[in-house]
Amino acid sequence: MVLPRLIPRLSRSAFKVAQANNRVFNAPFRGMASSAGVGSGKIRTVIGAVVDVQFEQDNLPAILNALTIDRGEGNKLVLEVAQHLGENTVRTIAMDGTEGLVRGTSVADTGAPITIPVGRGTLGRIINVCGEPIDERGPIEATKFLPIHADPPTFAEQSTTAEVLETGIKVVDLLAPYARGGKIGLFGGAGVGKTVFIQELINNIAKAHGGFSVFCGVGERTREGNDLYREMKETGVINLEGESKVTLVFGQMNEPPGARARVALTGLTIAEYFRDEEGQDVLLFVDNIFRFTQAGSEVSALLGRIPSAVGYQPTLATDMGALQERITTTQKGSVTSVQAVYVPADDLTDPAPATTFAHLDATTVLSRGISELGIYPAVDPLDSKSRLLDIDVVGQEHYDVASNVQQTLQAYKSLQDIIAILGMDELSEQDKLTVERARKIQRFLSQPFTVAEVFTGIEGRLVSLKDTVRSFKEILDGKHDALPEAAFYMVGGIEEVVAKAEKLAAESK
């Protein structure tokens, strides 16, 4: 029993060596991996998404290898090896439905993990977990292919310098800055502007950094994925005629758990290629990271593992770490991840969100209360946090301005009950001044988005970090106390506030 278990470990190690020597798989290499015919077997058992396949003694496939079943008319079902059961039998997880499979059907070993197309040919396309296009726009034009399972960059390859990734969004850059190569949790309910916020980030990264983005729908509703695709076409993020800025990777809610558990790795592999081979600063969106954990839990149960706390898989921390550790900055480029986080029953101690929080560098909270005020982006300036808001990283001036903005907003929040009961007249002169400045800051945190221009009619603004810090410093110092609140709403820099105030004054005469 020891030898069959040892063989796959050795072959997997050999594959990692080959992968290190030739990180980018081109088409001929990929063809050789599948046509060399490492081995073939026959289906022994089918139980839902789990398929047991029996091989010859010398041809047992390695753990994580992709197996294929020809279903006719060019359709292939992909299986991923999960366990070796003994008696030359492997237990696999199907990446698609297993309806119609029968015992005795022939199964081919590709000799490598699931391998997907990468590079610019994927931009503007929608692909599934196996890298196949699902947008009915023909095959993907790609010359490079990579396996979805890879080791994270070595310590020597990683860049350990904490750098701020400028997004051009004032509230984010000032109060909860994103780390280049960091991981950000995006919290928000339905209808608070999560999709528009994501689209603006994609647009700004393309403009400011020339970088690409990968949107990964893990356990997405098919309708939401379709809506996102249509909105991206309307706003120009996806350009069917020219080069698009984003690749969409979907493992929908109705798909088997195997596909949902692996689709995040597919999206990450595409992002890694842009980072490592093209030196890009890439944005990777994962919606929803909880569904990744949920799918892993389903797979674990199907494989017969004993569950741990709350029914989650015993390998929860390992699975999450394997994904998150690959999201990092290297000497060549970076992958910065924005992950929507669903919190089951609003219980932050649930193992799934609790494991996710351990990896996050920043949290961006979208608030319904702020969106009801008509302030967009509806980012909560007091709830959103970042480990990069540190004097050693952002500098003394930025840190002081951000702290004073938060203190002013917190003071206004604590005075709101008094104002609601007694009115503004009962406040001291200092408190009145604090409230006036806080209301101006609150409105100045709003910003017209380029992707929302078709709805608002206001041209989008991308504000540099330097201008953002200077503008808020001037408001805190009282330089613009004489200007009306309305002038601070939906503008870019402070110069626009002054110009808008003059325009409002002229119109009122």
From Swiss-Prot:
The keyword Transit peptide applies. GO terms for cellular component: mitochondrial inner membrane; proton-transporting ATP synthase complex. Pfam families: ATP-synt_ab, ATP-synt_ab_N, ATP-synt_VA_C. It is found in: Mitochondrion inner membrane. CDD domains: ATP-synt_F1_beta_C, ATP-synt_F1_beta_N, F1-ATPase_beta_CD. Belongs to the ATPase alpha/beta chains family. One of its GO terms (biological process) is proton motive force-driven mitochondrial ATP synthesis. HAMAP family: ATP_synth_beta_bact. Residues 1-32 form a transit peptide. PANTHER family: ATP SYNTHASE (PTHR15184), ATP SYNTHASE SUBUNIT BETA, MITOCHONDRIAL (PTHR15184:SF71). It is a peripheral membrane protein. SUPFAM superfamilies: C-terminal domain of alpha and beta subunits of F1 ATP synthase (SSF47917), N-terminal domain of alpha and beta subunits of F1 ATP synthase (SSF50615), P-loop containing nucleoside triphosphate hydrolases (SSF52540). Mitochondrial membrane ATP synthase (F(1)F(0) ATP synthase or Complex V) produces ATP from ADP in the presence of a proton gradient across the membrane which is generated by electron transport complexes of the respiratory chain. F-type ATP synthases consist of two structural domains, F(1) - containing the extramembraneous catalytic core, and F(0) - containing the membrane proton channel, linked together by a central stalk and a peripheral stalk. Gene3D superfamilies: 2.40.10.170, Bovine Mitochondrial F1-atpase, Atp Synthase Beta Chain, Chain D, domain 3, P-loop containing nucleotide triphosphate hydrolases. It catalyses: ATP + H2O + 4 H(+)(in) = ADP + phosphate + 5 H(+)(out). GO terms for molecular function: ADP binding; ATP binding; ATP hydrolysis activity; proton-transporting ATP synthase activity, rotational mechanism. InterPro entries: AAA+_ATPase, ATP-synt_VA_C, ATP_synth_F1_bsu, ATPase_a/bsu_AS, ATPase_alpha/beta_chains, ATPase_F1/V1/A1_a/bsu_N, ATPase_F1/V1/A1_a/bsu_N_sf, ATPase_F1/V1/A1_a/bsu_nucl-bd. ATP binds at G189, A190, G191, V192, G193, K194, T195, V196. Keywords: ATP synthesis, ATP-binding, CF(1), Hydrogen ion transport, Ion transport, Membrane, Mitochondrion, Mitochondrion inner membrane, Nucleotide-binding, Transit peptide, Translocase, Transport. It comes from Yarrowia lipolytica (strain CLIB 122 / E 150). The record marks S384 as: Required for activity. Its EC number is 7.1.2.2. This is ATP synthase subunit beta, mitochondrial. Transmembrane segments: none annotated. The gene is ATP2. F-type ATP synthases have 2 components, the catalytic core F(1) and the membrane-embedded component F(0), linked together by a central stalk and a peripheral stalk. The central stalk, also called rotor shaft, is often seen as part of F(1). The peripheral stalk is seen as part of F(0). F(0) contains the membrane channel next to the rotor. F-type ATP synthases form dimers but each monomer functions independently in ATP generation.
